[in-house]
């Protein structure tokens, strides 16, 4: 029974994340390996309110900075040659990947 690899990807840049996901999908289609996904997970949103005035006197005006973290999961049959090709996929600096054999 072939094992599966669960690939978790996350990034703050959605375009780069989708680029890597499409590379993995085309790799799986070329090799004819079974793939399920990409499954989009809920986007984490972190908001940090910061007071504009450095000294704290006068009117209190706030700036709100936010960062969104987008996540995807892909399950792929872990054939040895597919895993080797998967390691060669070019990944931008702001996309993070975890590979887990299940």
Swiss-Prot record:
<dbReference type="Pfam" id="PF00338">
    <property type="entry name" value="Ribosomal_S10"/>
</dbReference>
<dbReference type="GO" id="GO:0015935">
    <property type="term" value="C:small ribosomal subunit"/>
</dbReference>
<comment type="function">
    <text>Involved in the binding of tRNA to the ribosomes.</text>
</comment>
<dbReference type="InterPro" id="IPR005729">
    <property type="entry name" value="Ribosomal_uS10_euk/arc"/>
</dbReference>
<dbReference type="GO" id="GO:0006412">
    <property type="term" value="P:translation"/>
</dbReference>
<comment type="similarity">
    <text>Belongs to the universal ribosomal protein uS10 family.</text>
</comment>
<keyword id="KW-0687">Ribonucleoprotein</keyword>
<comment type="subunit">
    <text>Part of the 30S ribosomal subunit.</text>
</comment>
<dbReference type="InterPro" id="IPR001848">
    <property type="entry name" value="Ribosomal_uS10"/>
</dbReference>
<dbReference type="GO" id="GO:0000049">
    <property type="term" value="F:tRNA binding"/>
</dbReference>
<protein>
    <recommendedName>
        <fullName>Small ribosomal subunit protein uS10</fullName>
    </recommendedName>
</protein>
<dbReference type="InterPro" id="IPR036838">
    <property type="entry name" value="Ribosomal_uS10_dom_sf"/>
</dbReference>
<dbReference type="InterPro" id="IPR018268">
    <property type="entry name" value="Ribosomal_uS10_CS"/>
</dbReference>
<dbReference type="GO" id="GO:0003735">
    <property type="term" value="F:structural constituent of ribosome"/>
</dbReference>
<keyword id="KW-0689">Ribosomal protein</keyword>
<dbReference type="InterPro" id="IPR027486">
    <property type="entry name" value="Ribosomal_uS10_dom"/>
</dbReference>
């Amino acid at each position: 029974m072939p094992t599966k690899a669960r690939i978790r990807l996350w990034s703050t840049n959605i375009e780069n994340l989708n680029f890597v996901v499409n590379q993995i999908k085309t790799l799986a289609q070329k090799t004819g390996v079974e793939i399920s996904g990409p499954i989009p997970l809920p986007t984490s949103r972190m908001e940090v309110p910061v007071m504009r005035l450095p000294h704290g006197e006068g009117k209190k005006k706030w700036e709100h900075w936010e960062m969104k973290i987008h996540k995807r999961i892909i399950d792929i049959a872990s054939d040895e040659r597919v895993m080797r090709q998967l390691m060669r996929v070019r990944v931008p600096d702001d996309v993070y990947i975890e590979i887990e054999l299940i």
